[in-house]
Amino acid sequence: MYQTTAALRSAFLEFFRSNGHQVVDSSSLVPGNDPTLLFTNAGMNQFKDVFLGMDKRSYTRATTAQRCVRAGGKHNDLDNVGYTARHHTFFEMLGNFSFGDYFKEDAIRFGWTFLTEVLMLPKERLCVTIYQTDDEAFEIWNKKIGVAAENIIRIGDNKGAPYASDNFWQMGDTGPCGPCTEIFYDHGDHIWGGRPGSPEEDGDRFIEIWNIVFMQYNRQASGEMLPLPKPSVDTGMGIERIAAIMQGVHSNYEIDIFRALIAKAAEIIGVADLSNKSLRVIADHIRSCAFLVADGVMPSNEGRGYVLRRIIRRAVRHGNKLGATEAFFYKLVPTLIDVMGDAAKGLAETQVIVEKALKAEEEQFARTLERGLGILDSALNELQGDTLDGETVFKLYDTYGFPVDLTADVCRERNIIVDEAGFEAAMAEQRSRAQAAGNFGADYNAALKIDAETAFCGYSELTGNAKVTALYLNGESVPAINTGDDAVVVLDVTPFYAESGGQVGDKGVLMAQGIEFTVNDTQKFGQASGHKGTLTAGSLSVGQVLEAKVDKKLRHRTQLNHSVTHLLHAALRQVLGTHVTQKGSLVDPERLRFDFSHFEAVKPFELKQVEELVNTQIRRNHELKVAEMAIDEAKEKGAMALFGEKYDSQVRVVTMGDFSIELCGGTHVGRTGDIGLFKITSEGGIAAGVRRIEAVTGAAAMAYVAQQQAELEEAASLLKADAHSVVTKLKVQLDKMKQLEKEMQQLKDKLAAAASADLAGDAVVVNGVNVLIKKLEGVEAGALRGLQDELKQKLKSAIIVLGVAQEGKVNLIAGVSNDLIAKIKAGELVAMVATQVGGKGGGRPDMAQAGGSQPENLDAALSQVLPWITERLA
């Protein structure tokens, strides 16, 4: 009756709904309230604050079908996926929860009733485990449910410490915890394995299908277990495992969802054997990758994006192993949406973006995959022993984008071990080099440790009196500074904004009678604001009172750029999709720079839409509203928060009409109309999956438009056209140029043919082979290839090396007729010559080109060619 996975999901949620539970939608795979968690990996994640007593819901009973990912971090199943029957990067966790409502008896009864009366599982196939001292759970199972005592297994502290047990759950070293009971299904004695707690428990005969956690204690730092005033329940049942039982199969990869995905992958790639483990990997990985992108994660080189990249690249590698010759992974998304049913609603809404993101990442990796696999294969073939060295693993990672687990995956198939310690050492060395390069010329003030606090009054005031609480000169705390000293001044209160959130620090002046300190920058040092600059007049001591004056013009221009950054972020999410998230920003008086996640270059028409959308919001002249509120309230209102940023419990929320709402501590305009004009000046990629937009506002935007207009008028003048006909006139000129280039090439080809007739006579015969080695004068580098082709046709069986030196550069070409490439390859030949002229190159066995930077060495390099060829033709 409930054999399909979709039917199981519906039956579970309906059973608990009918028993007074609120059906709650699956939360995002990106945890919204837990910065310690990489991905949502359990049903209880979205209720963590409820269990901790920090949040209250309108219900005390809940049920969910939660999407989960376990890949990266502490919970990482990636290495085992495809090789075992039950490991997945993505799974659905069915769960029911009680927040101080029902407890052990009802929780156990609900689970047993659903399994034996709704799903009709045979009771004799089930056994349960409990924590060794949980007599209450034993009594419920034995006396009230009727499970025989021999089928109730007590599990003790089997992990080497008190309460460290498979049957005792803990959120952390302190906090809510408690015993749990697990329900196991017996697949039968035809499968190897023993009951839980037995020496053979790791076998596949007895499979855990449901875990019921009783949160009844609050563990103290001392280790003492105090009873919780309101015990709660957290349960979880993996839908894939229960689906396998209901569908009469032993492996999760044989259930309906995976059968459909495996069949589709095999069809796309062209594979007949549906039992191939690589198909399992691909079927699993499309689920995690598609849902992660749908929840806003984009492939990148850090954090969640890097885990996603690793999973995609592992799937692509397995497709390559099966013979895939073009992008295939993204083509599985429609099948995934179909088989996931109601659980894929959000995925269906973002299908186009998901497919584009997966395809872009696959195509990018495909460009280096073959070369990387070739290097790995060569390294493994030459390996002495059973361990691949860390340097090679690092080279594959650094040069070809091979995550270490992908390399390990290939090695595993050949029973080779990866030297992970060596890889980590190479990584550490690279980080040290990068850090050393980054620290070159570093400001000594960056290391200041200031034990003081500075209150900020600069949201409403740009001037004010303040007392000097500390002075720093050459990185040391001093009581006073003198004229000409470059120093850091710390005040008790300041209108100067200290650099934060991408907004640069304010500039201005600190003044008193006979004293003037020019502030060139303002930086945060812990809770203090450091005013960095030069004392241009007088002397200054700790305790003196100064007038602090921010440069109003610079602050105003910075505010224009900061406010428009919020509008830009919102516009990008509207035009490109909600997967767009801020990756970095710079806001200064001259311009703004905004880095964001996106999987491809922003198209010109999309940039135009973004620009028009921002300018529309500027013209609407929204009032900027700023409010302080609890972080959870801000998120409920839809405020954008930056991943990785740490926020206090109270946050500052900046709202612009109904268009933009963000958490922000920066300074802003009063109304969007103050911005005046917004103009994008550039868009480009700065890293895989990260794009950058630079733009200007206000007077700078007007100046940029005026400059463009002036350049347009100058171009029109050169073309003898007006501004409206520049494009038409330019097209005419380009067409003429193409025709002239075509005619010029035809003339060059004729000259090359004539020259080849003369050159062919200079060939020498070595062991019956025509060999031509020539330095050419007055020949353009672009003509070398055509000349080489002509010479090959004339000389038939031949080896040709031609070189040209011009404008401080060397250009080389080598050609080898097909009958000789078994003995001599053009790529090796041209590389040998190139190394002697300060260059490198390569190509096909029959034709290869190279360049160099040492034309003075060309004659000597060419003189080495004949002996090199003679030796190989002997």
UniProtKB/Swiss-Prot annotation:
The keyword Ribosomal protein does not apply. Consists of three domains; the N-terminal catalytic domain, the editing domain and the C-terminal C-Ala domain. The editing domain removes incorrectly charged amino acids, while the C-Ala domain, along with tRNA(Ala), serves as a bridge to cooperatively bring together the editing and aminoacylation centers thus stimulating deacylation of misacylated tRNAs. It comes from the Bacteria. PROSITE patterns: AA_TRNA_LIGASE_II_ALA (PS50860). Pfam families: DHHA1, tRNA-synt_2c, tRNA_SAD. One of its GO terms (cellular component) is cytosol. It catalyses: tRNA(Ala) + L-alanine + ATP = L-alanyl-tRNA(Ala) + AMP + diphosphate. Its main location: cytoplasm. NCBIfam families: alaS. Keywords: Aminoacyl-tRNA synthetase, ATP-binding, Cytoplasm, Ligase, Metal-binding, Nucleotide-binding, Protein biosynthesis, RNA-binding, tRNA-binding, Zinc. Zn(2+) binds at H562, H566, C664, H668. Catalyzes the attachment of alanine to tRNA(Ala) in a two-step reaction: alanine is first activated by ATP to form Ala-AMP and then transferred to the acceptor end of tRNA(Ala). Also edits incorrectly charged Ser-tRNA(Ala) and Gly-tRNA(Ala) via its editing domain. It is found in: Cytoplasm. This is Alanine--tRNA ligase. Belongs to the class-II aminoacyl-tRNA synthetase family. One of its GO terms (molecular function) is zinc ion binding. SMART domains: tRNA_SAD. InterPro entries: aa-tRNA-synth_II/BPL/LPL (IPR045864), Ala-tRNA-lgiase_IIc (IPR002318), Ala-tRNA-ligase_IIc_anticod-bd (IPR018162), Ala-tRNA-synth_IIc_core (IPR018165), Ala-tRNA-synth_IIc_N (IPR018164), Ala-tRNA_ligase (IPR050058), Ala_tRNA_ligase_euk/bac (IPR023033), DHHA1_dom (IPR003156). One of its GO terms (biological process) is negative regulation of DNA-templated transcription. Binds 1 zinc ion per subunit. It comes from Shewanella oneidensis (strain ATCC 700550 / JCM 31522 / CIP 106686 / LMG 19005 / NCIMB 14063 / MR-1). HAMAP family: Ala_tRNA_synth_B.
